[in-house]
Amino acid sequence: MDSNTVSSFQVDCFLWHVRKRFADQELGDAPFLDRLRRDQKSLKGRGSTLGLDIETATHAGKQIVERILEEESDEALKMTIASVPTSRYLTDMTLDEMSRDWFMLMPKQKVTGSLCIRMDQAIMDKNIILKANFSVIFERLETLILLRAFTEEGAVVGEISPLPSLPGHTNEDVKNAIGVLIGGLKWNDNTVRVSETLQRFAWRSSHENGRPSFPPKQKRKMARTIESEV
C-alpha cells in the first residue's frame, strides 16, 4: 500500500476529529455540519477499503499534523492561505430535505464512476425538480454532496450521491449522472426541471425553463441502460 495513501487517510481522520469537536460545541453552521456527516461516511468507506482502523489512524494523523505545525511559521501560513483558491458551498436543499427518509416501490440503481444513482420508477405523470448541495470553485462544480429529485408534494423520488468507498468525481461525472437520472424519470412521462443553481454550475445543456430536452430515442436508451445494470 502506498505510504502517501495511508498518511493522507490518517490526516483526514484527525482533521475530521477536530471538526467534530468544533461541532460538538455547537459552533458549526449548516454547511459545516452537512460536510461533517458526509465526510464521516467517506472515511468509514476508505478505512474499510484500506483495512485501517479509524481510531488508530486518527492518533497517527495527530502526530503528523503536530509535526507540521511545529515547523510552520505564521508568515508561511498566511502565504499558503492567500495562494489557495476558495470554494463556495451552495445549497438548494434544507437540512430537512437532505435527511428526509424515502423508499422506492420500483427501485432502480446505477453506479457511474464514483456516483450512485437511485430512482423510483413507479413514479408517473409527476412534476419533478432536481435540487443539490455542492461546492463550487472557479465557477464550476467542485464536489457534489447530494442531489435529490422531489415531486411538487415534497416526496423524494430519486437521488445521486457519492460512494463513500470511491471518493472523487468530476464535473462531467455529475453531468452524466444527472442525464441518466433525468432520462429514467422522464421515461414514465414525468416532467423534470433542474434548479437554477444546478443549471448554472452543473447542467448547462438545458433550456431556459430548466427542462433538459431528450429525444424519445435517447430517453428509451437511458432507461434501458438503468434497467440492464441493476
UniProtKB/Swiss-Prot annotation:
Residues 206-230 are annotated as: Disordered. Upon interferon induction, ISGylated via host HERC5; this results in the impairment of NS1 interaction with RNA targets due to its inability to form homodimers and to interact with host EIF2AK2/PKR. GO terms for molecular function: protein serine/threonine kinase inhibitor activity; RNA binding. Signal peptide: none annotated. GO terms for biological process: symbiont-mediated suppression of host cytoplasmic pattern recognition receptor signaling pathway via inhibition of RIG-I activity; symbiont-mediated suppression of host gene expression; symbiont-mediated suppression of host mRNA processing; symbiont-mediated suppression of host PKR/eIFalpha signaling; symbiont-mediated suppression of host type I interferon-mediated signaling pathway. Residues 1-73 are annotated as: RNA-binding and homodimerization. Keywords: Eukaryotic host gene expression shutoff by virus, Host cytoplasm, Host gene expression shutoff by virus, Host mRNA suppression by virus, Host nucleus, Host-virus interaction, Inhibition of host innate immune response by virus, Inhibition of host interferon signaling pathway by virus, Inhibition of host PKR by virus, Inhibition of host pre-mRNA processing by virus, Inhibition of host RIG-I by virus, Inhibition of host RLR pathway by virus, Interferon antiviral system evasion, RNA-binding, Ubl conjugation, Viral immunoevasion. Residues 180-215 are annotated as: CPSF4-binding. SUPFAM superfamilies: Ns1 effector domain-like, S15/NS1 RNA-binding domain. It comes from the Viruses. A motif (Nuclear export signal) lies at residues 137-146. Homodimer. Interacts with host TRIM25 (via coiled coil); this interaction specifically inhibits TRIM25 multimerization and TRIM25-mediated RIGI CARD ubiquitination. Interacts with human EIF2AK2/PKR, CPSF4, IVNS1ABP and PABPN1. The dsRNA-binding region is required for suppression of RNA silencing. This is Non-structural protein 1.
